[in-house]
UniProtKB/Swiss-Prot annotation:
Protein name in UniProt: Ubiquitin-fold modifier-conjugating enzyme 1
Quaternary organization: Interacts with UBA5 (via C-terminus). Interacts with UFL1. Interacts with UFM1. Interacts with KIRREL3.
Record keywords, A-Z: Isopeptide bond, Ubl conjugation, Ubl conjugation pathway
GO annotation, biological process: brain development; protein K69-linked ufmylation; protein ufmylation; regulation of type II interferon production; response to endoplasmic reticulum stress; reticulophagy
Species the sequence originates in: Mus musculus
Family: Belongs to the ubiquitin-conjugating enzyme family. UFC1 subfamily.
SUPFAM superfamilies hit by this protein: UBC-like (SSF54495)
Comment, domains: In absence of UBA5, the active site is solvated by water molecules thereby reducing its nucleophilic activity. A linker region of UBA5 is required to reduce the amount of water molecules in the vicinity of the active site and elevate its nucleophilic activity.
Glycyl lysine isopeptide (Lys-Gly) (interchain with G-Cter in UFM1) cross-link site: 122
């Protein structure tokens, strides 16, 4: 997987038990409860370790998720909208997170602003179905992607802090 710190963070995220997706009706409701419990625990753990970096909410059915994530670089906060839909084959298929604001600004992204997770994250997800959920997607997918891509985009001048842009 990754370094020891990442392993520790992931070990503190509750694993999920219900193997269900949106078309499984009653089982999907149970899976959503587990997803929310896992996300809440992950966010609480992040806040307790002064590493709060995203907010997520969903539509009523739990099939469309949206929110914000942020990355601190040189004491400046870079904030981005995020969105994803739960695939009909979830949890076998991991959701594809989109950061629309960064669409076309990095090679590690597909059309529509969907971040590239194929090489590192998707094989890990596949080995851990149905135990991994949305909290794991954030911790092992979006978090590391932001940590690599945002500083690189800043260094190349592709993105600038909003305060610097308004001056």
């Amino acid at each position: 997987m990754a370094d020891e710190a990442t392993r520790r963070v992931v070990s503190e995220i509750p694993v999920l038990k219900t193997n269900a997706g949106p078309r499984d009706r009653e089982l999907w409701v149970q899976r959503l409860k587990e997803e929310y419990q896992s996300l809440i625990r992950y966010v609480e753990n992040n806040k307790n370790s002064d590493n709060d970096w995203f907010r997520l909410e969903s539509n009523k059915e739990g099939t469309r998720w949206f929110g914000k994530c942020w990355y601190i670089h040189d004491f400046l906060k870079y904030e981005f909208d995020i969105e994803f839909e739960i695939p009909i084959t979830y949890p076998t298929t991991a959701p594809e997170i989109a950061v629309p604001e960064l669409d076309g600004k990095t090679a590690k992204m597909y059309r529509g602003g969907k971040i590239c997770l194929t090489d590192h994250f998707k094989p890990l997800w596949a080995r851990n179905v149905p135990k991994f959920g949305l909290a794991h997607l954030m911790a092992l997918g979006l978090g590391p992607w932001l940590a690599v891509e945002v500083p690189d985009l800043i260094q190349k001048g592709v993105i600038q802090h909003k305060e610097k842009c308004s001056q």
